[in-house]
Amino acid sequence: DSLGREAKCNNNAGGCTKIYNPVCGTDGNTYPNECMLCVENQKRQMPVLIQRSGPC
């Protein structure tokens, strides 16, 4: 859908993988991977969705 999809946020207690698999957030920022977007969402009031796979 055009609004984006929620990131799949598994338990990130162990930290995020270093694998570069970029996703474009609905905030216009490119995140290194879905997990890093999840970590950012934990700091926000309004979660960022994934607009598309790949860099913005």
UniProtKB/Swiss-Prot annotation:
SUPFAM superfamilies reported in the protein's UniProt record: Kazal-type serine protease inhibitors
Major site of localization recorded for this protein: secreted
Residues marked Reactive bond for trypsin (site): 18-19
Tagged with keyword Coiled coil: no
Site note Necessary for sperm binding, residues: 20-21
Compartment(s) of residence: Secreted
UniProt domain Kazal-like: residue ranges: 3-56
InterPro entries in the record: Kazal_dom (IPR002350), Kazal_dom_sf (IPR036058), Prot_inh_Kazal-m (IPR001239)
Disulfide bonds, paired cysteine numbers: 9-38, 16-35, 24-56
Pfam families in the cross-refs: Kazal_1
Gene Ontology CC entries for this record: extracellular region
Presence of keyword Metal-binding: no
Keywords: Disulfide bond, Protease inhibitor, Secreted, Serine protease inhibitor
Family matches, as SMART domains: KAZAL
GO MF entries: serine-type endopeptidase inhibitor activity
Biological function: Serine protease inhibitor which exhibits anti-trypsin activity. In the pancreas, protects against trypsin-catalyzed premature activation of zymogens.
Annotated protein name in UniProt: Serine protease inhibitor Kazal-type 1
Organism: Equus caballus
Species lineage: Eukaryota, Metazoa, Chordata, Craniata, Vertebrata
